[in-house]
Amino acid sequence: MTSQFKNSINDYLEGLPEAVLTRLYQSPATCLAVFRLLPALARTLIMGMIFNPDPIAVADVDALVKPSSQRLKLETQKKLRLLHIFTETQAHIIINPTFKKNLRAALVGGDQNISFGVPCDTEDKHKVDVAFLDAHAVSQWEMILHFMVGTSIGRTPSDGVLNLLKHSGLMEPERGGLRITNAGFQFLLQDVNAQIWTLLLQYLNMSEYLQMDPVDVLNFIFMLGSLELGQDYSLSALSETQKHMLEDLRDYGIVYQRKASSRRFYPTRLATTLTSETAALRTASQSMEAATQDTISSSVAADSGFIILETNFRLYAYTESPLQIAVLNLFVNLKTRFANMVTGQINRDSVRFALSNGITAEQIITYLSVHAHPRMKGMEHVLPPTVVDQIKLWQLEMDRIRATDGYLFSEFKNFDEYKDVSTYAKELGVLLYENPGKRKFVSTLAGSQQIVEFVKRRNQKHRSSAN
């Protein structure tokens, strides 16, 4: 998991009241998951305390840390205090007894309270293997990503998924449908593990509005991260909240159930890697591919870049993935598609199209850099500086020119009439543009009706004076 999203889930936990965290720490599986999410120094300090019956002296902690790392030590202790794992006196550091007891139970296998799930004790007549679970997870997750980038694959995510995408700000309503937002494009830049945590954090936020117990929700998420891939688990130990969650998580590809009424479920690799230290991977399919290989080198290869960008703005993408091609289509004018490659051109219109849809120049540059071909990453500049500068200039151009709907007033009888009416528009604060020499000005649409009424009153007053 990436450090960015570790911080996000930790930030969420740090914001919880002590009473809620104490309830969370009653689950050994949750204690183990929280422990895995902590930075290395925090884990070291905790391991030095959970098998020690006495509080640890502050001086002993200081002795464990180099003088040059004192700032890191203070930050770590602050994090552990916010998580209510540590409390400190002037002389000692005391570990939360509930956390201590249940983390120790998780580490030594003393958990008797089924927090790590209940494996089914009967054989599944429709048992599935790991390859099937991987394919199912890829299919469900990439369906969501395809929908976000506007690729038609014949299937649409469930209403629950669509509501979550809107609630999280990854997509927004437009013309009866949904379109990807700036945050949504940033979401596509993350590895699949980080993407899942993004949606799960938003799910946690939504659960509060739905009056779901956040402790139940978190315990289930952390439990999923500790389950065994390929093992089927019983629903008998799940609360009603967790059974409801299971229905939602099926739609994300995090768990598999053959049918809604099934009394068993299988965690997929998207679930079992939630709290793991697996290297970040860029897509669900690459994650599955790398996870099933025997060597580290294959994992690295699965994540190698595929984009070559030339100084003439021509782009070559060595990919067969419809999803990656659809993402490129958001800011590249694609020209030709071959069996394992697409070509295209980055130009003013394609970048302006992306900018108008909320994607920033920096995000485009980041995407191209992250997915650059190894040959490009070996050069002095990963991307041609001229291309990078031009993409930024196109955004500056968009920032300078803003389109605003307005109402044009012209053909005044004389300059006095023009001046009276334009002055009135200024006083109302609805004047957008004026050209006194040509006796023209533009007002906002909202203020145009008031100006029309003013012109009518002025003309009527002048006619009355003439009579």
Curated annotation (Swiss-Prot):
It is found in: Nucleus. Transmembrane segments: none annotated. It holds the Pfam family Tfb2. Coiled coil: none annotated. Keywords: DNA damage, DNA repair, Nucleus, Transcription, Transcription regulation. One of its GO terms (cellular component) is transcription factor TFIIH holo complex. InterPro entries: Tfb2_C (IPR040662), TFIIH_p52/Tfb2 (IPR004598). GO terms for biological process: nucleotide-excision repair; transcription initiation at RNA polymerase II promoter. Disulfide bonds: none annotated. It comes from the Eukaryota. The keyword DNA repair applies. One of its GO terms (molecular function) is ATPase activator activity. Component of the 7-subunit TFIIH core complex composed of XPB/SSL2, XPD/RAD3, SSL1, TFB1, TFB2, TFB4 and TFB5, which is active in NER. The core complex associates with the 3-subunit CTD-kinase module TFIIK composed of CCL1, KIN28 and TFB3 to form the 10-subunit holoenzyme (holo-TFIIH) active in transcription. Component of the general transcription and DNA repair factor IIH (TFIIH) core complex, which is involved in general and transcription-coupled nucleotide excision repair (NER) of damaged DNA and, when complexed to TFIIK, in RNA transcription by RNA polymerase II. In NER, TFIIH acts by opening DNA around the lesion to allow the excision of the damaged oligonucleotide and its replacement by a new DNA fragment. In transcription, TFIIH has an essential role in transcription initiation. Belongs to the TFB2 family. NCBIfam families: tfb2. This is General transcription and DNA repair factor IIH subunit TFB2. It comes from Yarrowia lipolytica (strain CLIB 122 / E 150) (Yeast).
